[in-house]
Amino acid sequence: MDTKALEELLGIRAPWRVAGIDVDVALQEVVVRVACERTEWCNTQRRLHVHGWEKRRWRHLDLWQCRTIIEAEVPRLLNPATGRTEMAAVPWAESLSRWSKRFESWAVEVLLHTRSLSDGSRLLRLGWDACDRIMRRAVERGLQRRTLEDVKLVGLDEKSFRQGQDYIALMTDLVGARVLEVVEGAGQKEVEALWQTLPQAQRQAVEAAAMDRGQSMIAGTRAAAPQAAIVHDRYHISAEQNQAVDRVRRAEHKQLMAQGDETLKGTRYHWLSGLEKLSDAAFASFENLVRINLKTSRAWELKTTFESFWVQADAPRGLAFFKKWKNRALRSRLPVFVKLAQSLATSLPELLNYFAYRITNAMSEGFNSVIQQLKAAARGFRSFANYRSRILFFCAKLDLKPSL
C-alpha cells in the first residue's frame, strides 16, 4: 500500500510519518511503526526540552482483517513553567488513550448498538475492562461538550439500584428528552447534589420540575432551586390512586371470602388496568362487577373520575374540579380515599402548577425500560459508577465520539 494512503487511513500527519510495517501472519497482527521528524518542540511561549522518548502503542481499526497496532516513540517534554513532564500530543489519538481516535469512534458505535459490554468486547476483540474505559471516556468527553443553556423544564425521579432499598436520583431534560445526571441515593442531600450538578446560572434558569410527592424530592428542590415551580407528576398521582383502589379491594375481598363470596377473586387486573387493555370477555365481566354495590366499585369510580382533573382548561377550573372530587371522596365512607383526598389537598398548589407547565415525568418513566435492559444485560452492576456511566452513555444524548 502507498505510504501516503496508509497515513491517511491511520490519521497520521506531519511531523509524523509511517516508517515501516510488520506483519505477523500467525498472530494476525499488523504493527505500523511511526516515526517523528521533528527535533524541537515549542508551546505558545517558549521552546520545550525533550526529557526523553517513550514507546507507545495504540489499537487501530483492523487492516486486512488483522488486529492493527500503531507504534511510535513519543517525546516526553519538560514544561519549564510547571517543572513537569508531559507526553507530546499525537494526531491519531487523544491524550492518555490506548486507542486511536478512529478505533475509539468505532468502538463507541459498536457499544451503542450492542447495549452489552460482553457483546461489545467480543465484537471489538477487546477485554471487558478496555470496553468499560472506552465507555467512561466517551461519557466524560460528552459531558465536557454538552451545553445546558436551553434547559428550562426538568423531571426528577428515583430508580432502584441494587436489590433492596438502594436508589439513585435521576434528572431529565423534559424538552430535550435526555438524562442530565444521576447521583447515588435519593434523600434530600442527594437531591440537592443532583441539582448542583447544573451550573448555578443554569440551575437558576430552570422554570419548573416534575416529580412525585416524596418529601426528599420536594425539600431538595426548594433548597437548591427555590425559583423552580414544583409540578406533581400525574403518573405518580395515578399510582397513588391505584394503590388506594387496591387496598380497598384487598380488604373487601378478605371480608367477602370469609362469607364464601368469591366475587372479587382474580379481578385485581380489572380494577388497576385501563379499560382499553381488557379483552371483550374481561370487559363484559368488569361491567357486571361495577354494577354491584361494592366498596371497590366506588373506589374505582373515584379513581377514574380524578383522571378528568388533568384535562381541565386551566388552574381555576382545575381547582373547582378538585374541590368537587374531594367532597365526593370525603363522603365516600372509604377511609383510604378520605385519607388520600386530605393528603392531595395539602399538595394542591403543586397539582395546580400542572396547568401552567403541562409537564409530566412520562419521559423518566420511559427511560425505565432502557435502564432495566441495561441492568439485565449487565446482570447487575458492581458499582454505582458503572451504573451511572451506562445510563449517561445510552440516555443522555451526548456527543460521545472523538473529534477526528
Predicted regions and their residues:
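Short, conserved DNA-binding cores of transcription-related domains
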Residues: M1-V90
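The DNA-recognition helices of helix-turn-helix-type DNA-binding domains
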Residues: G127, A138-G142, R213, A228, ...
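Glycine-rich phosphate-binding "P-loop"
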Residues: V90-R98, L174-K189
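Short, polar/flexible loop-turn hinges at active-site or ligand-entry regions and domain interfaces
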Residues: W92-S95, Q204, A228, E252-M257
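Short, positively charged, Gly/Tyr-enriched micro-motifs
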Residues: W53-Q165, Q204, A210, A223, ...
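Short alpha-helix plus adjacent loop in nuclease-associated cores
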Residues: I237-A258
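Acidic/histidine-rich catalytic cores and adjacent linkers
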Residues: C36, Q163-D166, D173-L174, E184, ...
